[in-house]
Amino acid sequence: MAAIALCASSAAPGADQPPICADRPGKATGTCIVPTGHWQIETGLADWSEQDGGGERDTSLAIGETTIKYGLTDRSNIEVDVAPWQRATSHFAGAHESDSGFGDINVLFKQLLTSAAAPWQVAALPLVKIPTASHSLGNGKWEGGLLIPIGYSIPKTKLGIGLTPEIDWAADADGAGHHAAMAQVVSLGWAASEKLNLSAELWGAWDWDPAGTTRQASADGSVAYLLGNDVQLDAGANLGLNRVTPDVELYGGVSVRF
Protein backbone atom coordinates (compact mmCIF):
# COMPACT_ATOMS: atom_id res chain seq x y z
CA MET A 1 0.00 0.00 0.00
CA ALA A 2 2.94 2.36 0.56
CA ALA A 3 3.33 2.57 -3.19
CA ILE A 4 0.10 4.50 -3.74
CA ALA A 5 0.94 7.64 -1.80
CA LEU A 6 4.70 7.66 -2.28
CA CYS A 7 4.61 7.24 -6.04
CA ALA A 8 1.96 9.90 -6.32
CA SER A 9 3.78 12.57 -4.40
CA SER A 10 7.52 12.14 -4.04
CA ALA A 11 9.18 12.00 -7.44
CA ALA A 12 12.32 14.10 -7.31
CA PRO A 13 12.67 16.78 -9.99
CA GLY A 14 14.95 15.59 -12.76
CA ALA A 15 14.96 11.98 -11.58
CA ASP A 16 15.30 9.43 -14.38
CA GLN A 17 12.57 7.34 -12.81
CA PRO A 18 9.90 7.95 -10.18
CA PRO A 19 10.70 6.51 -6.73
CA ILE A 20 10.62 2.76 -6.29
CA CYS A 21 7.05 1.46 -6.11
CA ALA A 22 6.92 -1.77 -4.10
CA ASP A 23 4.05 -3.99 -3.01
CA ARG A 24 5.67 -4.10 0.42
CA PRO A 25 4.61 -3.35 3.08
CA GLY A 26 1.06 -4.50 3.76
CA LYS A 27 -1.28 -7.02 2.17
CA ALA A 28 -2.58 -4.72 -0.56
CA THR A 29 -1.06 -4.95 -4.03
CA GLY A 30 -0.22 -1.79 -5.96
CA THR A 31 -1.01 -1.08 -9.60
CA CYS A 32 2.46 0.25 -10.41
CA ILE A 33 4.75 -1.52 -12.90
CA VAL A 34 8.52 -2.02 -12.66
CA PRO A 35 10.15 0.16 -15.38
CA THR A 36 11.01 -1.67 -18.60
CA GLY A 37 14.28 -3.56 -18.39
CA HIS A 38 14.68 -3.01 -14.64
CA TRP A 39 14.81 -5.58 -11.84
CA GLN A 40 13.21 -5.11 -8.45
CA ILE A 41 13.86 -7.23 -5.35
CA GLU A 42 11.42 -7.00 -2.42
CA THR A 43 12.61 -9.00 0.60
CA GLY A 44 11.07 -9.69 3.97
CA LEU A 45 14.01 -9.74 6.34
CA ALA A 46 11.83 -11.41 8.99
CA ASP A 47 8.11 -12.17 9.39
CA TRP A 48 6.80 -13.61 12.68
CA SER A 49 3.25 -14.48 13.74
CA GLU A 50 1.53 -16.06 16.75
CA GLN A 51 -1.90 -17.55 17.34
CA ASP A 52 -3.32 -18.86 20.65
CA GLY A 53 -6.46 -20.90 21.07
CA GLY A 54 -7.86 -24.18 22.31
CA GLY A 55 -4.90 -24.85 24.56
CA GLU A 56 -2.48 -24.59 21.65
CA ARG A 57 -0.08 -21.85 20.61
CA ASP A 58 1.14 -21.74 17.01
CA THR A 59 4.01 -19.58 15.82
CA SER A 60 5.57 -19.09 12.42
CA LEU A 61 8.77 -17.43 11.30
CA ALA A 62 9.89 -16.68 7.75
CA ILE A 63 13.31 -15.34 6.85
CA GLY A 64 14.13 -13.87 3.47
CA GLU A 65 10.76 -14.19 1.73
CA THR A 66 11.50 -12.47 -1.58
CA THR A 67 9.62 -11.22 -4.63
CA ILE A 68 11.77 -10.87 -7.76
CA LYS A 69 10.26 -8.61 -10.43
CA TYR A 70 11.31 -7.71 -13.96
CA GLY A 71 9.77 -4.95 -16.09
CA LEU A 72 8.71 -6.34 -19.47
CA THR A 73 7.04 -3.20 -20.87
CA ASP A 74 5.80 0.09 -19.47
CA ARG A 75 2.51 -1.69 -18.70
CA SER A 76 3.57 -5.16 -17.55
CA ASN A 77 6.03 -7.03 -15.35
CA ILE A 78 6.64 -10.62 -14.28
CA GLU A 79 7.12 -11.65 -10.65
CA VAL A 80 8.40 -14.72 -8.79
CA ASP A 81 7.83 -15.18 -5.05
CA VAL A 82 10.20 -17.47 -3.15
CA ALA A 83 10.34 -18.42 0.53
CA PRO A 84 13.84 -19.80 1.20
CA TRP A 85 13.26 -20.62 4.88
CA GLN A 86 10.15 -20.98 7.01
CA ARG A 87 9.51 -22.52 10.42
CA ALA A 88 6.13 -23.50 11.86
CA THR A 89 5.87 -24.52 15.53
CA SER A 90 2.92 -25.77 17.59
CA HIS A 91 3.04 -25.74 21.41
CA PHE A 92 0.52 -27.88 23.31
CA ALA A 93 0.26 -29.77 26.63
CA GLY A 94 3.85 -29.05 27.59
CA ALA A 95 5.21 -30.34 24.26
CA HIS A 96 5.84 -28.88 20.84
CA GLU A 97 6.19 -29.86 17.20
CA SER A 98 8.22 -27.88 14.69
CA ASP A 99 9.15 -28.09 11.04
CA SER A 100 11.20 -25.84 8.81
CA GLY A 101 12.34 -25.63 5.22
CA PHE A 102 11.74 -24.12 1.80
CA GLY A 103 8.28 -22.75 1.02
CA ASP A 104 6.08 -22.69 -2.07
CA ILE A 105 6.91 -20.62 -5.18
CA ASN A 106 4.42 -18.23 -6.80
CA VAL A 107 4.70 -16.99 -10.38
CA LEU A 108 2.73 -13.86 -11.27
CA PHE A 109 2.19 -11.54 -14.24
CA LYS A 110 0.98 -7.97 -13.71
CA GLN A 111 -0.73 -6.03 -16.50
CA LEU A 112 -1.80 -2.40 -16.07
CA LEU A 113 -5.30 -2.00 -17.54
CA THR A 114 -5.69 1.80 -17.37
CA SER A 115 -3.72 4.70 -18.79
CA ALA A 116 -1.09 6.42 -16.67
CA ALA A 117 -3.24 9.57 -16.63
CA ALA A 118 -6.42 7.85 -15.40
CA PRO A 119 -7.57 8.97 -11.92
CA TRP A 120 -8.30 5.36 -10.99
CA GLN A 121 -5.55 2.87 -11.72
CA VAL A 122 -6.47 -0.80 -12.28
CA ALA A 123 -4.26 -3.80 -12.94
CA ALA A 124 -4.73 -7.57 -13.36
CA LEU A 125 -2.42 -10.04 -11.65
CA PRO A 126 -2.94 -13.76 -12.39
CA LEU A 127 -0.83 -16.15 -10.32
CA VAL A 128 0.15 -19.80 -10.14
CA LYS A 129 1.45 -21.51 -7.00
CA ILE A 130 4.09 -24.19 -7.53
CA PRO A 131 4.02 -26.70 -4.63
CA THR A 132 7.68 -26.74 -3.61
CA ALA A 133 7.19 -26.65 0.19
CA SER A 134 7.53 -29.69 2.42
CA HIS A 135 4.26 -31.41 3.36
CA SER A 136 4.05 -29.86 6.83
CA LEU A 137 4.64 -26.34 5.43
CA GLY A 138 2.41 -26.64 2.36
CA ASN A 139 -0.35 -28.79 0.90
CA GLY A 140 1.63 -30.18 -2.03
CA LYS A 141 -0.98 -28.99 -4.55
CA TRP A 142 -0.93 -26.64 -7.52
CA GLU A 143 -3.16 -23.62 -6.98
CA GLY A 144 -3.97 -20.40 -8.80
CA GLY A 145 -5.69 -17.08 -8.48
CA LEU A 146 -6.38 -13.61 -9.85
CA LEU A 147 -5.86 -10.26 -8.11
CA ILE A 148 -7.32 -6.97 -9.39
CA PRO A 149 -5.36 -4.13 -7.71
CA ILE A 150 -7.18 -0.78 -7.76
CA GLY A 151 -5.63 2.51 -6.67
CA TYR A 152 -6.71 6.14 -6.43
CA SER A 153 -4.68 9.17 -5.32
CA ILE A 154 -7.04 11.73 -3.80
CA PRO A 155 -6.53 15.11 -5.56
CA LYS A 156 -4.95 17.97 -3.59
CA THR A 157 -4.10 15.64 -0.70
CA LYS A 158 -1.30 13.29 0.27
CA LEU A 159 -3.74 10.41 0.63
CA GLY A 160 -4.26 7.36 -1.53
CA ILE A 161 -6.82 4.58 -1.30
CA GLY A 162 -6.54 1.07 -2.61
CA LEU A 163 -8.56 -2.10 -3.07
CA THR A 164 -7.21 -5.57 -3.81
CA PRO A 165 -9.96 -8.10 -4.50
CA GLU A 166 -8.64 -11.63 -5.05
CA ILE A 167 -10.25 -14.88 -6.17
CA ASP A 168 -8.38 -18.17 -5.75
CA TRP A 169 -8.57 -21.79 -6.90
CA ALA A 170 -7.52 -23.47 -3.66
CA ALA A 171 -6.84 -27.13 -2.91
CA ASP A 172 -9.29 -29.00 -0.68
CA ALA A 173 -8.02 -29.86 2.79
CA ASP A 174 -8.38 -33.58 2.04
CA GLY A 175 -6.44 -33.23 -1.23
CA ALA A 176 -9.32 -34.59 -3.29
CA GLY A 177 -9.99 -31.51 -5.42
CA HIS A 178 -10.17 -27.72 -5.48
CA HIS A 179 -12.63 -25.05 -4.36
CA ALA A 180 -13.09 -21.28 -4.46
CA ALA A 181 -11.56 -18.85 -1.99
CA MET A 182 -11.36 -15.08 -1.99
CA ALA A 183 -9.78 -12.15 -0.16
CA GLN A 184 -10.20 -8.39 -0.03
CA VAL A 185 -7.96 -5.59 1.21
CA VAL A 186 -9.08 -1.99 1.76
CA SER A 187 -6.17 0.43 2.23
CA LEU A 188 -5.50 4.05 3.10
CA GLY A 189 -2.03 5.51 2.63
CA TRP A 190 -0.65 8.87 3.72
CA ALA A 191 2.56 10.40 2.37
CA ALA A 192 3.73 12.06 5.59
CA SER A 193 6.77 13.43 3.75
CA GLU A 194 8.62 12.90 0.48
CA LYS A 195 10.29 9.85 2.03
CA LEU A 196 7.88 8.56 4.67
CA ASN A 197 4.57 6.82 4.07
CA LEU A 198 2.11 5.46 6.64
CA SER A 199 -0.73 3.11 5.78
CA ALA A 200 -3.66 1.31 7.40
CA GLU A 201 -5.54 -1.67 6.04
CA LEU A 202 -8.49 -3.93 6.71
CA TRP A 203 -8.11 -7.46 5.34
CA GLY A 204 -10.62 -10.29 5.02
CA ALA A 205 -10.42 -13.79 3.55
CA TRP A 206 -13.04 -16.46 2.90
CA ASP A 207 -12.16 -20.10 2.15
CA TRP A 208 -15.07 -22.33 1.11
CA ASP A 209 -13.43 -25.71 1.64
CA PRO A 210 -15.93 -28.60 1.45
CA ALA A 211 -14.82 -29.59 4.97
CA GLY A 212 -15.95 -26.22 6.32
CA THR A 213 -15.81 -22.50 5.58
CA THR A 214 -13.05 -20.42 7.17
CA ARG A 215 -13.28 -16.65 7.56
CA GLN A 216 -10.29 -14.56 8.60
CA ALA A 217 -9.89 -10.83 9.24
CA SER A 218 -7.17 -8.45 10.41
CA ALA A 219 -6.47 -4.76 11.01
CA ASP A 220 -3.01 -3.83 9.75
CA GLY A 221 -0.62 -0.90 9.89
CA SER A 222 2.72 -0.28 8.21
CA VAL A 223 5.41 2.29 7.53
CA ALA A 224 7.70 2.69 4.52
CA TYR A 225 10.75 4.94 4.22
CA LEU A 226 12.70 5.82 1.07
CA LEU A 227 16.45 5.67 1.62
CA GLY A 228 16.91 6.75 -1.98
CA ASN A 229 15.09 6.72 -5.29
CA ASP A 230 15.67 2.96 -5.64
CA VAL A 231 15.72 1.72 -2.01
CA GLN A 232 12.86 1.43 0.48
CA LEU A 233 12.75 0.12 4.06
CA ASP A 234 9.52 -1.05 5.69
CA ALA A 235 7.96 -2.48 8.83
CA GLY A 236 4.45 -3.44 9.84
CA ALA A 237 2.10 -5.10 12.32
CA ASN A 238 -1.11 -7.06 11.70
CA LEU A 239 -3.69 -7.75 14.42
CA GLY A 240 -6.16 -10.62 14.06
CA LEU A 241 -9.84 -9.79 14.46
CA ASN A 242 -11.19 -13.32 14.99
CA ARG A 243 -10.08 -16.63 16.47
CA VAL A 244 -8.91 -18.27 13.24
CA THR A 245 -6.60 -15.38 12.29
CA PRO A 246 -3.11 -15.06 13.81
CA ASP A 247 -3.35 -12.84 16.88
CA VAL A 248 -0.34 -10.77 15.86
CA GLU A 249 2.09 -10.62 12.94
CA LEU A 250 5.23 -8.47 12.89
CA TYR A 251 7.55 -7.98 9.93
CA GLY A 252 10.19 -5.81 8.32
CA GLY A 253 11.89 -5.71 4.96
CA VAL A 254 13.69 -3.88 2.18
CA SER A 255 13.02 -3.27 -1.52
CA VAL A 256 15.68 -2.43 -4.11
CA ARG A 257 15.37 -1.52 -7.80
CA PHE A 258 18.22 -1.65 -10.31
Model-derived regions: residue spans:
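Transmembrane beta-barrel domains of Gram-negative outer membranes and organellar outer membranes
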Residues: 14-258
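N-terminal signal peptide c-region/cleavage motif recognized by signal peptidases
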Residues: 8-10
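Sec-dependent signal peptide recognition
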Residues: 1-3
